[in-house]
Amino acid sequence: VKNAVIVPQGAKGGFILRKVPTERDALAAEGIACYKIFLRGLLDITDNIVNGKLVPPANVVRHDDDDPYLVVAADKGTATFSDTANAISAEYSFWLGDAFASGGSVGYDHKAMAITARGGWVAVERHFREMGKDIARDAFTAIGVGDMSGDVFGNGALLSKNMQLVAAFNHKHIFIDPMPDAAKTFAERARLFALPRSGWNDYNTALISKGGGVFERSAKSITLTSEMRTALGTDAKTATPDELIRIILKAPVELLWNGGIGTYVKAASETHEQVGDRANNGVRIDGAELRCAIVGEGGNLGFTQRGRIEYARKGGRINTDAIDNSGGVDCSDHEVNIKIALGAAVAAKRVTLKARDALLKKMTDEVADLVLVDNRLQTQAITIAQGQGVSLLEPASQLMTQLESEHFLNRAVEYLPDSKQLAELRSTKQGLTRPE
């Protein structure tokens, strides 16, 4: 679904390090060396374009049609490898040049543009607007997954000066501020965002309201003050760090902003084993247990799809990660398409590479605006569809049947209702949820 707003189809690829050095620099060097092997392997079997003509790879039996389009996207672990990938592209004289890997030194820096978080924030603002609240003007309470050094969480937590961040956690620390002062805490979050590799332990505790604090996730037990209990809506006097994270996730706040890594919400009908994220089994809750009004999914896979549906069925406002965080993928796609368009002019020596680079940089704000239009329109489309309620079930059913017959859709994989479940929805006068 995330690739619906862009040109290519997507696939996940990866590679495994056979030798894993313990020393940090050696590990990075080994990772890059293996990344190069992986990319050369891909380009060895990819069609190229030379002087406008398609050239298949040598000594390769091709079972598919001509297909020279291959781009690689930065992901967890390879986020800083774009220049390395583009050097391999140059080594192979690959037709895409430095459009092969977006976001390199001559490309759009997603974190500097805050594009993924800004796209997710478009969705958050829509949810609030549909509840009758303008968060550009009014204060709102929030909890978060992530920390200020992260692109999605950090940028997201700086998109409104009215955010009252009650609690947040990352893999090392838990931050709790029961009665936050929006102005003071915004300035402190901005300081942490600018501080390289900052964590919640770097937060100036003098700015935390009475009864709050920053706690280690390695602690045996944490005492919950009366202020913490009120803010988080719990009677527990003490809790282990894992128990406290579950309490935070269930807090009665307006927004849950997820900018972290891991799956924290499943459906009651799912087991932890089915989720496939063992590291977070101890902190995961069910969708029906959430008490926040809105979820913004800046990070990937924060919820299972069933968890989203369960939360939405009890009145929660949520889209999906693919909708909320499509900004990064969308921005990369714009970059690649602009580079392809200008590539022919550069090759024909009508434009110098330096002039192309200057033009790319000049277009940064315009590209961001175009990406955010997609975020606005796709969340609007979901709202319009949701507004049709029960009347949408029949056309949706026909569309699903058609897509299944053409092998574009597998309802079971996407957790979409079958004909029996659709009949139940009709009889109880319920439409599809936003995630569906």
Map each language-model feature to its residues.
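Short acidic-glycine loop/turn motifs at beta-strand connectors
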Residues: 9-10, 19-20, 157, 268-269
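Segments forming glycine/polar-rich beta-alpha architectures that bind adenosine-containing cofactors
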Residues: 1-9, 14
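Short, surface-exposed loop/turn segments at secondary-structure boundaries that line and modulate
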Residues: 14-15, 150
